[in-house]
Amino acid sequence: MQIRPIEPGDNEALAKVIRTALAEFGANKPGTVYFDPTTDALYELFRTPGSFYYVATIDEVIVGGCGIFPTENLPQGTCELVKLYLAKEARGTGLGKQLMEISLSWAKENGYTKVYLESMPELAKAVSIYEKVGFKALDHPLGNSGHCGCDIWMLKEL
């Protein structure tokens, strides 16, 4: 297992991991990253200042990723934990938690004081992991992610 920064050639494989995972959980619906055109151009998206994306590989095959993004209209000092998805074979290995911890560390090292995320009931297992690492439920969304299909919003202080 290796975790590394996103590279220009990663877009297609990452989009496939993300969309396959969403479909497996029945979360491939409008208003989610499944239909978000930026899912096909993650390398370009994560060239945005204040953002970073980590890619996980097993035997040089991309099996997931996770990132930090300065989503529009979030409160001062807040970033969003985004696009944490794993291929089926990488789930249950601790890799998701590792990706999340590395991303949260990057956020803190880069001056963020809070991390926001959006999810949905179909991804209940992920939501329970977020709670275990200190994310707290909110009763409304923050910022403007454009993902109206997400109705679980959480925030963590770093």
Q: What are these language model-derived features?
A:
Residues 87-89, 93, 121-122:
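Active-site acidic-Proline motif in GNAT/NAT acetyltransferases
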Residues 20, 24, 92, 105-109, ...:
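Conserved amphipathic alpha-helical interaction elements at protein-protein interfaces in regulatory
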Residues 5-89, 100-102, 141-143, 157-158:
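Acetyl-CoA-dependent GNAT
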Residues 20, 113-116, 120-158:
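C-terminal "cap" of GNAT-fold acetyltransferases
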Residues 1-3:
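Extreme N-terminal starter segment of soluble prokaryotic enzymes
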Residues 60, 64, 94-96, 134:
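Conserved phosphate-binding and hydrolysis motifs of nucleotide-dependent enzymes
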Residues 98-114:
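Conserved acyl-CoA
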Residues 76, 94, 125:
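Residues that form or flank phosphate/diphosphate-binding pockets in enzymes
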